[in-house]
């Protein structure tokens, strides 16, 4: 069930009861799946220095970021996506490590025009592989992302060569789509970046698929 209250911020959602139960049921299945492939969970900050995304995010994301000064007049933002933060962590802690596999389930924020499947406050489930040990990692991640999405729906198509809208990607990426969602059919996107590769699933959109 979804509630609406007076003066609720546009593009946010209040969920209750069966809806919340179903979300956690799917989430727990997704976590069990990726951990069977050697991924470990990571939790990330929701508030970041906005400069993290200036060079890494594409123009569309930059225009949608929630940016504001903190009490010391430093520009910070609500996280618009998670991969850029994982990249920074990798550069600080995992440079000399062998392959590292992480998963995350994080709330993100973008100032978009709200509609079905597109919210200003939304959840992403993602997987990142740092220092991949095989040239076949992209194919493996596509298979894993498909397996995750098929926990909810079999109505999945894959585009194996997509130009992604984030500045840190170094090659063609991939997308998974659910046609029944219409204009908001993309439910997963991923690709390679410096020293890593990963994908993120729009969890709220995936929940709309049947």
Annotate each PLM feature.
Residues 1-210:
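TRNA-recognition modules of translation machinery and tRNA-sensing kinases, especially anticodon-binding
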